[in-house]
Regions:
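Conserved G1/Walker A P-loop phosphate-binding module
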Residues: 2-91, 95-97, 107
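P-loop NTP-binding site
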Residues: 202-313
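Conserved glycine(s) of the Walker
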Residues: 32, 173, 265
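Active-site glycine-centered loops adjacent to acidic/histidine catalytic or metal-binding residues
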Residues: 74, 137, 167
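Canonical P-loop GTPase G-domain recognition
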Residues: 130-131, 140-198
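Conserved C-terminal guanine-recognition region of P-loop GTPase G domains, centered on the G4
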Residues: 64, 69, 91-163, 234-237
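Catalytic P-loop NTPase motifs of RecA-like helicase/translocase cores
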Residues: 55, 79-80, 112-113, 142-143, ...
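Conserved, well-folded catalytic cores of nucleic-acid-processing
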Residues: 43, 62-66, 96, 100-103, ...
Length: 313
């Protein structure tokens, strides 16, 4: 990210009191939480794919708005969990909601009707007594009469503190949300360095970008059956970096699919990941990828700890 881009998305600070706080983004899978956070921060800090349940752990993006620091917490989508990993992801989402100074419920208003996951989230909010604001996302994909009717329908289910209509993809309405959020943040010293954009370590970012490309290039349930780890990160004298990533698959048969004939599939995916990593880190990247079979990777306690997930959720 260039200095000019950083300045554009983080208005200049001035002398005086500072504010800082957390904004928790919750919603059904694929509501657009990661896209919104990236738009708010002005930088890609969370991976985005058309597939549901892409985000596995809580990711924090940091935006400066004058003398206010807004820390966005992108939580996994909330849905009915079936596996251990699902339960841990949903638990992390609700924990993120509890930790926020402001809670934003994102809803994909382009859907034909309110989805069951969103209805379940609203019922949980009612029981907890939590205050939440509604963000109807993807207004660019539907007609005004549709999302206005959806607004009325959702308002009858829950007394939202504030309602916004946006397109996180195009940026329409995003500034209004950011301005309002800045007003809600409590007076406080900054919680992160004002130059920081995320608390995500570079090694984890590299693994996440590779995982995003796997989701975009592999079909059906296969991407959900794999994970990516950064095995090593080596700085080179010429200023470039050598990154070794390991892709773990749950079934031996999946290994061949990921590799492709003559290794062409993983080569194509790796090239896409390398190009994006070079753009993010603004340096040359040497990316080396391995594909390994590890049947029980979903039951590895250490991996859950790395993702900031509760293994026993």
């Amino acid at each position: 990210m260039t200095d000019e881009q950083h300045a554009e998305n983080n208005p200049a600070q001035s002398d005086g009191p500072t504010s800082a706080g957390f904004v928790a983004l919750i919603g059904a899978p694929n509501a657009g939480k990661s896209t919104l956070m990236n738009a708010m921060v002005g930088y890609k800090v969370s991976i985005v794919t058309p597939k549901v349940q892409t985000t596995r752990s809580r990711v924090r993006g940091i935006a400066m708005h004058g003398n206010t620091q807004i820390i966005f917490v992108d939580t996994p989508g909330i849905f009915t969990p079936k596996r251990r990993l699902d339960r841990a992801m949903v638990s992390a989402a609700w924990q993120g909601a509890e930790d926020g100074d402001v809670l934003l419920l994102l809803h994909d208003c382009a859907r034909k009707k309110i989805d069951e996951d969103t209805l379940a989230i609203i019922e949980t909010l009612k029981k907890s007594g939590a205050r939440a604001s509604l963000v109807l996302n993807k207004t660019d994909l539907t007609l005004p009469e549709h999302y206005l009717a959806r607004t009325k329908e959702l308002s009858e289910l829950y007394d939202f503190e504030k309602i916004f209509m946006i397109s996180a993809e195009s940026g329409e309405g995003v500034d209004d949300v950011r301005d309002w959020l800045a007003e809600q943040m409590p007076q406080s010293p900054y919680l992160f360095d004002p130059e920081d954009l995320s608390d995500l370590p570079m090694r984890l970012m590299a693994a996440e970008i590779m995982r995003e490309k796997l989701f975009l290039n592999l079909h059906q349930e296969l991407p959900y059956q794999m994970t990516v780890e950064c095995e090593s990160w080596e700085e080179r004298e010429d200023g470039s970096a050598e990154i070794k990533l390991v892709i773990f698959v749950a079934r031996e048969g999946h290994r061949g699919i990921v590799l492709g004939k003559g290794g062409q599939t993983i080569k194509r995916i790796g090239q896409a990941a390398r190009r994006e990593l070079e753009e993010i880190f603004e340096r040359r990247i040497h990316l080396i990828s391995f594909v390994k079979h590890k049947k029980d990777w979903m039951d590895d306690k250490d991996r859950y700890r790395d993702w900031d997930l509760d293994f026993n959720a």
